[in-house]
Amino acid sequence: MSSSVGTSAIDLYWLPLGAGGHSVRLNGRIFEWVAARIEHRDRCDLYHSALEVRGREGRFVIEQAPAWSEGGERGVVAVGSVGTRAAGRVQLFRYEIRRWRDGVIPDVAEAVESPRRLSDDADCARRLLELVPQVPTPVWGRDELHTGEMWNSNSLISWLIARSGLDVDSVARPTGGRAPGWRAGIVVAHREQAKAAPATTAGSG
C-alpha cells in the first residue's frame, strides 16, 4: 500500500465490485443492468471502496466486509445485518466494520485508479480514525435511513470522509464507474452535521 513510514495520510482505494469473487461480480452486473434499464442510461462498472489511514497511532485499513468469523484480529469495531435485521442473528448475514491496524485490503492488486490521496494532515487522519466506531450500522442493502439509496460499504467510506471534514464531493469515481451507496453516506453525514451545528452555536453563546 501507498503511505510511507512516518507520514500521515488518508488514501482511498477503488476495487471492482466482487474482485476475486465471481458470484458477487455476476450479481453486481445483473444489478447494474437492471438499474441502467430503469434509469435509461448506459451500464457502468461498479466499485467498492476502502481506506488506508496512516497517523501517529500507526497504519490502519478501514473497510466494511462480511462477518464470517470472530473479528478480534481484524480490528472490528461494529457489526450490522444484511438484508433484514432478523437475518443478522445468523453470522452469515452480518457485516463488520474494520479499523484494522496493519491490516490488508483483499484484492488490493485489482484496485483501479488507486490509491487516491485525500489528505496528509495528521489531525484529519486522527479524527477519521476516531469516527469509525460511530458510523451508522443500518441494514446492508436497504434504505432504512431514507436517503434514496441503499446503505453499503461505500456509504461507510463516504460518511467517514464527510464527517472528518474532507471535501467528499470532490472525490471522483473511476472513469466510467459507479459506486452505489456513496450518496447515502454523504446524505447521512450532512444531516448529522446540520443537527450538531445548532447545538454548537447554542453552547458558544
Residue ranges and their predicted role:
Residues 56-59, 162-170:
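Short helix-capping/linker segments at secondary-structure and domain boundaries
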Residues 140-144, 168-173:
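Surface-exposed patches in mature extracellular/periplasmic domains of secreted proteins
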